[in-house]
Each structure stands twice: as C-alpha cells, then as structure tokens.
Swiss-Prot record:
Keywords: Cell membrane, Lipoprotein, Membrane, Palmitate, Signal. It is a lipid-anchor. It comes from Salmonella typhi. A lipid is attached at residue 17 (N-palmitoyl cysteine). The lineage of its organism: Bacteria, Pseudomonadati, Pseudomonadota, Gammaproteobacteria, Enterobacterales. It holds the Pfam family UPF0257. A lipid is attached at residue 17 (S-diacylglycerol cysteine). NCBIfam families: PRK02939.1. Belongs to the UPF0257 family. The keyword Cell membrane applies. GO terms for cellular component: plasma membrane. Residues 1-16 form the signal peptide. This is UPF0257 lipoprotein YnfC. It is found in: Cell membrane.
Length: 236
C-alpha cells in the first residue's frame, strides 16, 4: 500500500487529522441544572451519569446521579451530600419534578423541561432567548448567571440585603477541556476563596477523572482541601 493512501485511511479512522470534529455545546437544561444543583455539566447524547466527589482520604463527600431522555431532559436527578448530611431525589412528571419518595411536587418547569419555580422556597427562574437560566429571584435574594458562547457556566453573582457574593471562572484555552478551570469567590470586594480543577476527558470532551483543589481564604492561614472526581457516563 502506498504511504499517501495509508495516511489518508488513518486520518479517516481518526476522524480527521488536522480538522477534528468540534465538541457539542452544552444544552440550556444541562448548564442550568448544573448551576442550581452543583455538579459538572456534560455535553453530547448523555443517557445516564454519576459524579462522585472523594476527599483526599478516599471518603465519598458527595455524589450526583442522573438519567436523561434523548431530548436532553432530566428524567431523574439524585444528589447526596454526605459532608452536610443532605440529599434530594427528583423524578420528572409532566411540568414538575416530584420528590421520588413522597411524590410531592418540588420544582415547576417551563418550556421543554427547564427550571421555572421552586414554590416551597418562593424562588422563580428566568431564562434568556436561548433557554438558559440567567437569574433566580427569591424573597430576599437574586442570583445572576453567566455562560460562554458554548453554554458553559462562567459563574454567578448572588445579591442579598447584607452583601454580594460573586464566583468567576476562567476556563482553559482548549475548547475540549472546559472543565479545566480556575474560579475565584468574592464577598463584596474581598476574595474569600479559589478553586482549581484539571481533568482527563473522553471522546465527547466530557470529564472522566478530575482533581479539584478548594482553598478557603476566609481564614488565616488559608486552608486547602483536595478532592478527586470520578465520572461514569453512558451515551445514547
């Protein structure tokens, strides 16, 4: 076989040598739910997933699991925060998410399957023209969310009567490594913490294994917490 033909075939097998396919953008639902329920957003035809946050001692600190329809709606979402002994399990039912155990209506939806309101807490969400949640308003607070051109969350600003808390993320310059980032937290103009994360990725540019360092700068000296994140993702 001639070398040029061999190279051409290799390029076809590898999905293009110099022009690889760009990863998919984040859907409005995935990006918005990750903001509200505090997990790393995923892209592509995700069928189900789990994210497990583990301390440097190897203990599970938090776990998130979810199943999605082919249209990208969350059919189920379950969260367990072992450090704070809290949890939540939601199941989709028409225009609501119900508590998976009590079947109580918890979250009201808008559009296809986007967040609209949390009646028990008096919280309502507003979306932009693309369907991304850009603000949440409650009785004594308002949260504003920011995204990049591919729908990745860039941070949020929470305003209440006492102060303003802002989180701002700076992403990797590699568009396939969105979960490699640094983020800074501020209360008013005072920096109180920072986060650094780096990951290994699969063919869909989703994180498989991540290393997370959280630095609490509100205390002196600052305290660092090291975690690993294990992701399991199944696709359609």
């Amino acid at each position: 076989m001639k070398k040029p033909l061999l190279l051409t075939l290799l390029c076809m097998i590898l999905a293009g040598c110099d022009n690889p396919k760009s990863p998919e953008s984040f859907t409005p639902e995935m990006a918005s739910f990750s903001n509200e329920f505090d997990f790393d957003p995923l892209r592509g035809p995700v069928k189900d997933f789990s994210q497990t946050l583990m301390s440097e001692n190897g203990e599970v600190a938090k776990q998130v699991t979810g199943t999605l329809s082919q249209e990208g709606c969350f059919d189920t979402l379950e969260l367990h925060d072992l450090e704070n002994n809290t949890g939540l399990a939601l199941v989709l039912d028409a225009n609501y998410y119900r508590d998976a155990q009590t079947l109580e209506k918890k979250v009201q939806l808008q559009g296809k399957c986007q967040l609209a309101a949390l009646p028990s807490a008096g919280v309502t969400w507003e979306t932009d023209d693309n369907g991304f949640v850009v603000s949440a308003t409650g009785k004594e607070m308002k949260v504003e969310y920011r995204y990049d051109s591919e729908g990745y969350p860039l941070g949020k600003t929470t305003i209440n009567s006492q102060n303003t808390l802002s989180v701002t993320a700076k992403l990797s310059t590699d568009s396939r490594k969105k979960l490699d980032y640094t983020a800074v937290s501020r209360v008013d103009d005072r920096q109180v913490g920072n986060v650094t994360q780096s990951c290994e990725y699969d063919a869909y540019a989703n994180p498989v294994d991540c290393r997370l360092v959280i630095v609490d700068e509100s205390v002196k000296p600052a305290v660092s917490h090291h975690y690993t994140i294990k992701n399991r993702i199944d696709y359609y």
